[in-house]
Amino acid sequence: MNFDVNSKLKLLFGYINFSGDGMKFLANLTRNSVIWMCMLGCIGLQSAENSGVSDSSEWPTYRGNTSGTGYSPLEQITLDNVNNLEVAWTYSLRNDSSQSAREPNSQATPVVIDGVMFLPTADRVVALDPLTGEELWSHSVPENAPSRRGVTYWPGQGGISPRIFYTAFDQLIALDAETGDLDLEFGESGKVSMGIPYISVPFVYKNIIVVGANTPRGAIGGIGNARAFDAINGSKLWEFESVPSPGNPGNETWEGDSWEGRLGANAWPFYFTVDESKDQLYIPLASPIPFAYGGDRAGTNLYANSIVAVDIHSGEYHWHFQTIHHDLWDHDPPAPPTLFDVNYNGKTTPALGVTTKSGYLFVLDRENGEPIYGVSETAVPQSNVPGEETSPTQPIPINPKPMARVSFTTSEIVTAQDTSEEHAEACRNLVRSVGSITNDGPYTPWTYRSDDSNNETTLLFPGLSGGPNWGGIAHNPNNGYVYVFAANIGTLGWMEDAEPGSPLPYALTGPDGRPSGFSVRINGKTMPCQKPPWGQLTAVDTNSGEIAWQIPLGITEEFPSNRQATGRPGRAGALVTASNLLFIGATDDNRFRALNATTGDIVWEYQMERRGNANPMTFLGSDNKQYLLITATDKLMSYSLP
């Protein structure tokens, strides 16, 4: 941020007179803390004057870089000393001094820039001293809560101070990074209306801010186009039409006027990625809404369920790759592509990897969107819902093999030998209660129950919550591996005639009046009813397209000790470091783990109070110590070596 001396002194000692929009600065410091902070400040000033810590030692974006790799070149924490990690500090994401009823359920990954950490809490955006977790400033968000997923940093330009950008419902908001005050020079008094809600992290590249869209289920009107704004003044730069209007390529994939007013096909990911050598932005687009019935939208429905490459300066279309045609399962790409190079068949190719909730990892040439290891347009089961026109084929990667379970047979129902008699009996009761279970492999459509005499139930794998999810892919440039965490949770459901007056003739439902998980609850915990693993971490060698290793991740303590390694569900992703360590939380057993990134062996774990449902990050502090951080629901956890 290149703070000047006065700015650093303000951050060190606090303001005597509190002012600004919801600002609170630390004051009344003890003599010792003043001395300590002064020493820290002097170090910071000296570092700034001598170019300071290199960019690679910090964590400037949600995934560490604009390629989204989740990789850090730091190697102070190693396979040999990782077992010595201890908690350095914690920071509560609750606002104990306010009357706010907002409860934190944070999925945030902080950013660290020029020795300052920034992140959202339940009802604030805060700047912290990354060595201690002490607040430097706190900005209250009085209306809509800030995105629980993160904030982004813009370094400023031409006399304009650095800014922190965050979203709150449909507002894009700029703060002065040095003070936390609203930056009134941006937009209308520091705010810009995005035109649609977006509850994730704005993506900053040069002087461009890219945001996506969250179109609520059942909403009427409002389109999920990605948009770009000028980081200097907030003016709108471009908008990419994710459901093409007449005259634009792709409109022919929507029969008749089914494109018009169509919801979904929105860019909802937590972040974006860009190829800086080409200024090419990659936009992952979601399923059409409604997703379960597509009889009113015959066709492949571009650009839903696609990765679209555009010019980040203009939004001009370059290419696309559709991962599902005519989606009926809500199995969109939940995270943007991760960018890396592949050495395959004697050729180095600039590539990207993108997962889908359907359990697959697609590796594409990022210059043209062509699959590197091949994709097969595979015949898939067809729907019996009246009026539905299922796509006859779906694109399935030849390599790598699936990251999650994609099929099921009744022989795979869990037994007492797999877990426990109590669990197995509960699952047998569930199976008896739902009637006849159908799964015909990948992309099994929802079966239609025309009347009460039909008791057929579709069991979808992965279920509606998906296999891989928003955590995205981590890439290790040292061995060419990418790492994907996925859950194995099935969904039970069927289509039936909709209630009179409904906008569509058929509706998706299930055993409890809605689609439900193929699982039971024991002692308050979800226990899937198919054989484990229920959560798994996969390493893929991108230089061959083959799976290098795949392990269950997470334990179920309710089972006998020799049956606890079931894997547990989760949605977050991993962090990889140059010391060949992989760090991941994600699982609902509340563990934070380190693994050998080459072998998949677990080498360290820490039992947290709450779930680490967020992507971890790491940075090198001004004390030359490597810190490791993860958000655990309502608390930020920081670890370091002694």
Language model feature labels by segment:
Residues 21-35:
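Bacterial N-terminal signal peptides that target proteins for export
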Residues 41-54:
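Bacterial Sec-dependent signal peptides at the C-terminal "C-region" and cleavage site
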Residues 52-96, 112:
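Mature N-terminal segment immediately following signal peptide/propeptide cleavage
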Residues 59-63, 102-122, 145-171, 198-220, ...:
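Repeat-blade elements of multi-bladed beta-propeller folds
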Residues 394, 398-489, 536:
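Long, low-complexity segments enriched in small/aliphatic residues
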Residues 12-22:
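Short, Lys/Arg-enriched N-terminal segments with co-localized hydrophobic residues
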Residues 32-44:
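Bacterial N-terminal signal peptides
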Residues 81-94, 125-145, 158, 171-196, ...:
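Extracytoplasmic/lumenal domain signature
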